[in-house]
UniProtKB/Swiss-Prot annotation:
PANTHER family associated with the record: GLYCEROL-3-PHOSPHATE DEHYDROGENASE, GLYCEROL-3-PHOSPHATE DEHYDROGENASE [NAD(+)] 2, CHLOROPLASTIC
Lineage: Bacteria, Pseudomonadati, Pseudomonadota, Gammaproteobacteria, Pseudomonadales
Sequence positions that bind sn-glycerol 3-phosphate: K108, G136, K191, D244, S254, R255, N256
Family, per entry: Belongs to the NAD-dependent glycerol-3-phosphate dehydrogenase family.
SUPFAM superfamilies linked to this entry: 6-phosphogluconate dehydrogenase C-terminal domain-like (SSF48179), NAD(P)-binding Rossmann-fold domains (SSF51735)
Catalysis: reaction(s): sn-glycerol 3-phosphate + NAD(+) = dihydroxyacetone phosphate + NADH + H(+); sn-glycerol 3-phosphate + NADP(+) = dihydroxyacetone phosphate + NADPH + H(+)
Amino-acid positions noted as binding NADPH in the UniProt annotation, renumbered to this chain: S14, F15, R35, K108, S140, R255, V279, E281
Organism name: Pseudomonas putida (strain GB-1)
Keyword Lipid metabolism: yes
Keywords from the UniProt entry: Cytoplasm, Lipid biosynthesis, Lipid metabolism, NAD, NADP, Nucleotide-binding, Oxidoreductase, Phospholipid biosynthesis, Phospholipid metabolism
Localisation per UniProt entry: Cytoplasm
Enzyme nomenclature, EC number: 1.1.1.94
Protein name: Glycerol-3-phosphate dehydrogenase [NAD(P)+]
Length: 341
């Protein structure tokens, strides 16, 4: 990648726009592609993304575009910030163009039909590409407002990690590296489910002890499931695990938290999602995660409980009561209890 070669950001949402701005602030020319030509034109003219990041000026180095073919041809490093439901359909027709490029997924979701993570879909579409993911406690608006933030880029390709660090690392945005791509990406996808529960708990006025219990048991569930799928449990003690879980489960700026809060206020799921106006990946992830947990026989009572609330008519109070009545287990799965007398 030459100094003047643009970096591509695919997606016109809040996180894609925040990352595009970060790149441009570091002197990197950026082409931000979006499917809606009207959105691209409005962003070009007004230098703002009013639907997703209202009030944040779009850096002059970001060029909103609508031509995907030209964008991919011009860029060797591509950040993919497309909804999980659209990623395959958008990129599969251009598989040949992706050969050899660095593809970094920013999307925290799971494909419903296959239970594949976004980087696995990218790998399937473009097996000759260099694949990575970016994940962590990264609220888009705070990044755009230059709040001090850290993230993780994960890839088996060390040079790709270094390349991402070089273009993204800045005064207010620190980029760490990891080789556990699967664990980092799985942490980012799974925590969205628990943010819905956390938002509901706050709306219903539950105490700090309860919220702390929910977040901690969520981390236990996430780690238990991830290890069953081959991830490193230590990854979940870092930014992409507990870090992302804390911010997503405690901030009203989190989209999945907002959905949970609306549900706790008595809105239907459809009303909660419509009120948000953006994609809340946690709702889609919940369905496939519950099915997968049953398939591989991993104990995930919070996932089962939230599914019962959203799709089976249960209440959060009923789910927590069931959780409290369940047989007590050890606190941390990966610590031996052989020393008990």
């Amino acid at each position: 990648m030459t100094e003047q070669q643009p970096v591509a950001v695919l997606g016109g949402g809040s996180f894609g726009t925040a990352v595009a701005n970060l790149l441009a602030e570091n002197g990197v020319p950026v082409r931000q592609w979006m499917r809606d030509p009207a959105q691209a034109e409005a962003m070009r003219v007004n230098r703002e993304n009013p639907r997703y990041l209202k009030g944040i000026r779009l850096h002059d180095g970001v060029e909103p575009v609508n031509d995907l073919l030209a964008t991919l041809q011009a860029s060797e490093l591509v950040f993919v910030a497309l909804p999980s439901s659209a990623l395959r359909s958008v990129l599969a027709p251009h598989a040949e163009l992706l050969r050899g490029k660095g593809l970094v997924s920013l999307t925290k979701g799971i494909e419903a039909q296959s239970f594949k993570l976004m980087s696995q879909i990218l790998e399937e579409i473009a097996p000759q590409a260099r694949i990575g993911v970016l994940s962590g406690p990264n609220l888009s608006r705070e990044i755009a407002e230059h709040a001090l933030t850290a993230t993780v880029v994960a890839s088996e390709d060390e040079k790709l990690c270094q390349q991402v660090q070089a273009v993204l690392h800045g005064r207010t945005f620190r980029v760490y590296a990891s080789a556990d791509r699967f664990g980092v990406e799985l942490g980012g996808a799974l925590k969205n489910v628990y943010a819905i529960i956390a938002g509901m708990a706050v709306a219903l006025g539950m105490g700090e002890n309860t919220k702390s219990m929910l977040i901690t048991r969520a981390l236990a569930e996430m780690t238990r499931f991830a290890v069953s799928q081959g991830a490193n449990p230590m990854t979940f003690l870092g930014l992409a695990g507990v870090g992302d879980l804390i911010v997503t489960c405690s901030s009203p700026k989190s989209r999945n938290y907002q959905v949970g809060y609306a549900l706790g206020e008595g809105h239907s799921l459809e009303e909660a999602v419509n009120r948000l106006g953006e994609v809340a990946e946690g709702v889609n992830t919940l369905k496939v995660l519950k099915a997968k947990a049953q398939e591989v026989q991993v104990y995930m009572p919070l996932v089962a409980g939230l599914h019962a609330i959203l799709f089976e008519g249960r209440t959060l109070n009923q789910v927590i009561e069931h959780l409290m009545r369940a047989e007590p287990k050890t606190d941390v799965d990966f610590i031996s209890i052989s020393g008990f007398n």
